[in-house]
């Protein structure tokens, strides 16, 4: 925790360059070996900061009755043992608002740190890591709303990607592009919006798949044709001076 606190202090002090292991250990008056006893590198420290907060957050009594999720032991992740996601199921709905609100408080309480690491090329692309982390549970959320109905994996992926980007894309936007306080009272009832909308997306896409089939849904069977520009002859003049 000392490494995490020191790193989050140093990053805003040096916003245009990467804080190194040497600088971090010098700040704490410890040798580099001590750092490497805990972390492989600065990137793994950044991941731990975020994951450790989520794990600690989920220990709160608010989440006692929630279904916690960890990564599988064979996942390509430095901290698979730390829970990072939780679900509350209620009458066929996923009520995720309190989870996302509690998570956003961590970002808000460390706004300067996250505004830098989300926008700087000096560090691990933490946003990409977060998207990759949450896509699998969001896919499971889509399947929960399907309730046993069959849907092609490519459509499940589309819905999960759309909504995970909606949640975390909005958060990153606020922390890199605006100075707005994200916990406004006016939107307090909308923290579950992504999963409310996800249910509607599942119903809409399932209806389309069922009615027309996946080939029709994606635009007639066969491979997707990439746009290669308009052919010149389509715009040649007709005999009467009009464009064809």
List each language-model region with its residue ranges:
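Amphipathic alpha-helical linker/stalk segments
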Residues: 13, 50-95, 114-116
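An amphipathic alpha-helix adjacent to DNA-recognition modules
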Residues: 1-8, 12, 17-21, 29, ...
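Alpha-helical residues within the helix-turn-helix
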Residues: 26
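C-terminal peripheral helix-coil segments that are non-catalytic and often amphipathic
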Residues: 139, 143, 164-244
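Amphipathic alpha-helical packing segments from all-alpha helical-bundle domains
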Residues: 98-109, 121-147, 157-168
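A short secondary-structure junction motif
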Residues: 10, 56-60, 64, 110, ...
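Secondary-structure edge/capping motif, primarily at the C-terminal ends of alpha-helices
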Residues: 68, 111-117, 145-148, 174-178
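Short, residue-level hotspots on alpha-helical faces of the histone-fold
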Residues: 5, 48, 52, 128, ...
């Amino acid at each position: 925790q000392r490494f995490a606190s020191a790193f989050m202090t140093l990053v805003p002090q040096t916003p245009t360059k990467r804080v190194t292991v040497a600088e971090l250990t010098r700040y704490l008056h410890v040798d580099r070996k001590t750092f490497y006893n805990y972390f492989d590198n600065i990137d793994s420290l950044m991941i731990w900061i975020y994951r450790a907060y989520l794990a600690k957050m989920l220990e709160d009594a608010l989440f006692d009755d929630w279904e916690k999720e960890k990564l599988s032991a064979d996942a390509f992740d430095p901290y698979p043992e730390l829970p990072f996601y939780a679900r509350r199921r209620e009458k066929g709905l996923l009520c995720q608002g309190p989870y996302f609100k509690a998570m956003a408080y961590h970002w808000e309480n460390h706004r300067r740190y996250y505004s830098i690491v989300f926008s700087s090329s000096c560090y691990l692309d933490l946003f990409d890591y977060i998207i990759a982390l949450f896509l699998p549970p969001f896919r499971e959320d889509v399947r929960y709303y399907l309730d046993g109905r069959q849907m092609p994996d490519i459509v499940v992926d589309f819905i999960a990607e759309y909504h995970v980007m909606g949640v975390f894309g909005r958060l990153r936007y606020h922390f890199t592009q605006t100075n707005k306080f994200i916990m406004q009272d006016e939107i307090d009832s909308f923290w579950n919006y992504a999963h409310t909308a996800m249910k509607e997306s599942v119903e809409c896409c399932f209806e389309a798949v069922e009615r027309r089939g996946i080939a029709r849904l994606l635009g007639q069977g066969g491979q997707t044709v990439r746009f290669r520009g308009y052919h010149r002859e389509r715009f040649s003049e007709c005999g009467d001076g009009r464009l064809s």
